[in-house]
């Protein structure tokens, strides 16, 4: 019987194990039981044991690509795929290595904590496809890999593997070899490209040296060698790989300019990336030196100073990246006539305008066009009818945003920040996903129609002359994640109603004319569960904040994990070609400085309430925000002690509580925050000692503070207290002591009624002041 395969979802497989008399039930599942006859019982038990070796809470149980397959005739496991599922240590004695008949194994994107690469993989000598990419494997690839004689695909990319080139030369069936982004070094075997079936080779991001031998009979079609220095003679032999279709040689760090003549013999080449290398100016002027088959050409950061005329002849060109060069002058008119050109980046150059009439743009085939960070002046041209994403920020465009964009039905992303546009925001942007108009001279009110299409994810109109109120129609933006209207002239109360937006992560309202309380009625928590960045600085907000103000900030309460360096980057393949990547920008006060943050981390959490009229205690629930990176409450009227719970904000890097009326001592717990690089508590009423390592300006203006870095010594009446002021215990999940509240309820109620009667009848000033003091500092 032929080796047909029966796909078995691993959850269903575990269900059979759990009802088997030979295994104990650890889980219960509601999934339907599939026909498991093909898998023998000992194979089921081995798989169950393997899965139980790891934490599997990350497993996506609805992902039908994950699972286990058994051969119909033998009943043994021949295919196993657990992608982005497992956490733990892959030990040499793992039951994984019992599956000697495996032909396909995919364990990519897991979180293995092994310190070395298990040599037992070499025992799986029937495996044909092995994917261990995007894990945490370290050390050298064991020599036992040379036993995998049936291997056709080996994926080891994005690990931390070291040592010399793995011993794979005798694996003559290999067609796909991927070592991208590791730490391999040493010499590449000269015969590597002589392997008879090798069609894909990715050595990108390593430290290899040596020369390579090439045969014209090589079947290699895809070759990636870029990012790290590759010492040795490799460029000339590459010209003999006549079957190449994709070639990546970016950032080789070679000392001489590349001559495009090297690639003239590659008649099948469709993709060429030479970014980060110097290109011979002569070869950029002649069309004799470049394959006419090219569809994608990347020449980013190549030191090019004039637009290459060779592009005229590339009639099949679909994508070109000429960003981060030194090209000046005007963008040539013929460029828009290339019949297939759909995506182009000319960003970060010195272009100052367009050659000839810009009307030719309208009928071009362009879908994605980046021309930000140039010196282009004048009115914005009419965009191509096919445009989907357009970025032209950081130029000198002026005049009004043309209403012709209303007829661009495919337009999803419009980015025009840092220009000199005037007039009003067009009413017709309702179908866009990203609107970025920051730092222009736009005026009028925010259009009510912005959310008519319910697709808006980012709206950034900060630093303009916008007036009026925040339109309630923003409630229709159910997909909105990023809203920035800072530094305008908006006059309104705090938009509590925005809490209805389920995906809102960033809310920037700073430097407007907003006023009133920011605490919900009845002192309930502020309900923005997904909010990460909340900036309302320099307005006229007033009132107090309840101790439970931040209780419902669920996203910011999550602990930062190992994936905490991901940016808030949007990738939308709906554009139909290479993903459009957009990075949100915020202006923030961080470590005492005002700065622009162009990339907002997914795990990044910041609060800025500075420059308002807020009073009372700082909410103790602030300690629940474990992801909080920056907190600025300066220039308000907060009183009482700095909450001890701040010590629970373990990711805190910047803390500014200056120019308030805070009293007591600086909590010792702040000294344990390993990331806290900046603290400013100046101009308060604090006493005791400071945190060593900060500048003295961070503590000045507190008459009761003494010791380094201040000049005042701690002696006599200025000696610090022996212990912190006693406060109630502050747990992460409970910010009020409800037992104490319940115990004193009866007595407190009677006393409260009596005091209320006195106040209502006579309102003596002395009693009102006492009640006010207890209200804020109890």
Curated annotation (Swiss-Prot):
Subcellular location per the Swiss-Prot or TrEMBL entry: Cell membrane
Q: Where are the LRR repeats?
A: 99-123, 125-147, 148-171, 172-195, 197-219, 220-240, 241-265, 266-291, 293-313, 314-338, 340-363, 364-387, 388-407, 408-429, 430-453, 455-477, 479-500, 501-525, 528-552, 601-625, 626-649, 650-673, 678-700
Q: What induces this protein's gene, according to its Swiss-Prot or TrEMBL record?
A: By NaCl and mannitol.
Signal peptide positions on this chain: 1-24
On the tree of life, the source organism's domain of life is: Eukaryota
Its main subcellular localisation, reduced to a broad class, is membrane
- Membrane topology (Cytoplasmic): 761-778
**Cellular component aspect of the GO annotation:** plasma membrane
Which stretches face the Extracellular side?
25-739
Q: Which residues are glycosylated?
A: 60, 72, 93, 106, 111, 147, 170, 173, 253, 348, 363, 396, 407, 420, 431, 476, 632, 648, 680
Which topology term describes how it sits in the membrane?
Answer: Single-pass type I membrane protein
The transmembrane segments are: 740-760
Statement: the UniProt record of this protein carries the keyword NAD: no
Q: Which GO terms describe its biological process?
A: response to mannitol; response to salt stress
Among InterPro entries, the record links this protein to: Leu-rich_rpt, Leu-rich_rpt_typical-subtyp, LRR_dom_sf, RLP23-like
Record keyword ATP-binding present: no
What keywords sit in the KW lines? Cell membrane, Glycoprotein, Leucine-rich repeat, Membrane, Receptor, Repeat, Signal, Transmembrane, Transmembrane helix
Record's family? Belongs to the RLP family.
By its UniProt entry, which PANTHER family does this protein fall under?
Answer: LEUCINE-RICH REPEAT RECEPTOR PROTEIN KINASE EMS1-LIKE-RELATED, LEUCINE-RICH REPEAT-CONTAINING N-TERMINAL PLANT-TYPE DOMAIN-CONTAINING PROTEIN
**UniProt-recorded name of the protein:** Receptor like protein 28
What is this protein's gene name?
Answer: RLP28
């Amino acid at each position: 019987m032929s080796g047909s395969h029966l796909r078995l979802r691993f959850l269903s497989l575990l269900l059979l194990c759990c009802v088997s008399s030979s295994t104990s039930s650890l889980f219960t599942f509601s999934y339907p039981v599939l026909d498991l006859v093909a898998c023998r019982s000992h194979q089921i038990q081995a798989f169950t044991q393997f899965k139980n070796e790891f934490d599997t809470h990350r497993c996506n149980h609805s992902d039908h690509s994950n699972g286990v397959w058994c051969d119909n005739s033998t009943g043994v496991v021949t295919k196993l795929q657990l992608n982005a599922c497992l956490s733990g240590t892959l030990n040499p004695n793992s039951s994984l290595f019992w599956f000697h008949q495996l032909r396909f194994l995919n364990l990519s994107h897991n979180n293995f904590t092994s310190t070395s690469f298990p040599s037992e993989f070499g025992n799986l000598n029937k495996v044909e496809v092995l994917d261990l990419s995007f894990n945490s494997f370290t050390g050298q690839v064991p020599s036992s890999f040379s036993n995998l004689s049936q291997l056709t695909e080996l994926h080891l990319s994005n690990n931390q593997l070291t040592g010399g080139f793995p011993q794979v030369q005798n694996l003559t069936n290999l067609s796909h070899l991927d070592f991208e982004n590791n730490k391999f070094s040493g010499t590449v075997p000269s015969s590597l490209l002589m392997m008879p079936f090798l069609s894909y080779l990715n050595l990108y991001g390593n430290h290899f040296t040596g020369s390579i031998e090439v045969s014209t009979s090589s079947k290699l079609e895809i070759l990636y060698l870029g990012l790290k220095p590759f010492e040795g003679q490799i460029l000339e032999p590459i010209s003999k790989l006549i079957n190449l279709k994709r070639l990546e040689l970016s950032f080789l760090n070679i000392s001489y300019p590349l001559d495009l003549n090297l690639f003239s013999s590659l008649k099948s080449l469709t993709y060429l990336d030479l970014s980060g290398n110097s290109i011979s100016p002569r070869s950029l002027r002649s069309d004799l030196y470049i394959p006419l088959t090219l569809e994608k050409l990347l020449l980013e950061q190549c030191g090019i100073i004039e637009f290459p005329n060779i592009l005229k002849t590339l009639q099949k060109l679909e994508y070109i990246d000429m960003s981060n060069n030194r090209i000046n002058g005007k963008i040539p008119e013929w460029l828009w006539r290339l019949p297939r050109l759909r995506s182009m980046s000319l960003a970060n150059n010195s272009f100052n305008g367009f050659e000839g009439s810009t009307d030719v743009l309208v009928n071009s085939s362009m879908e994605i066009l980046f021309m930000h960070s140039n010196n282009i002046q004048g009115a914005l041209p009419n965009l191509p009818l096919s445009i989907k994403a357009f970025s032209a920020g950081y130029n000198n465009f002026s005049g009004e945003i043309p209403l012709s964009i209303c007829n661009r039905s495919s337009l999803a992303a419009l980015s025009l920040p840092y220009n000199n546009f005037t007039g009003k925001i067009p009413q017709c942007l309702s179908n866009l996903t990203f609107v970025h108009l920051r730092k222009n001279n736009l005026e009028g009110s925010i259009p009510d129609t912005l959310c008519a299409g319910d697709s808006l994810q980012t709206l950034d109109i900060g630093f303009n002359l916008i007036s009026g109120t925040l339109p309630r129609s923003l409630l229709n933006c159910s997909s909105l994640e990023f809203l920035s209207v800072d530094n305008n002239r908006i006059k309104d109360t705090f938009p509590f109603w925005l809490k209805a937006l389920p995906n809102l992560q960033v809310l920037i309202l700073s430097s407007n004319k907003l006023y009133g309380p920011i605490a919900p009625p009845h002192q309930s928590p502020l309900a923005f569960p997904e909010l990460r960045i909340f900036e309302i600085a320099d307005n006229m907000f007033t009132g107090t904040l309840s101790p439970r103000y931040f209780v419902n900030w669920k996203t910011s309460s999550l602990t930062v994990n190992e994936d905490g360096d991901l940016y808030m980057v949007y990738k939308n393949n709906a554009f139909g070609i290479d993903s459009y990547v957009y990075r949100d920008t915020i202006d923030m006060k961080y470590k005492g400085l005002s700065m622009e943050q162009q990339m907002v981390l997914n795990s990044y959490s910041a609060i800025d309430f500075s420059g308002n009229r807020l009073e009372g205690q700082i909410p103790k629930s602030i300690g629940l925000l474990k992801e909080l990176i920056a907190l600025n409450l300066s220039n308000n009227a907060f009183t009482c002690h700095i909450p001890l719970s701040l010590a629970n904000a373990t990711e805190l890097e910047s803390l500014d509580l200056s120019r308030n009326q805070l009293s007591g001592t600086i909590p010792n717990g702040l000294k344990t925050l390993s990331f806290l690089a900046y603290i400013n508590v100046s101009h308060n009423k604090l006493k005791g000692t400071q945190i060593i390592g900060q500048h003295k300006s961070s503590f000045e203006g507190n008459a009761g503070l003494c010791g380094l870095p201040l000049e005042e010594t701690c002696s006599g009446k200025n000696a610090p207290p022996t212990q912190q002021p006693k406060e109630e215990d502050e747990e992460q999940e409970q910010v009020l002591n409800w037992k104490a509240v319940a115990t004193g309820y009866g007595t407190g109620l009677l006393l409260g009624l009596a005091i209320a009667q006195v106040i209502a009848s006579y309102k003596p000033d002395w009693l009102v002041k006492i009640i006010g003091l207890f209200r804020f500092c109890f």
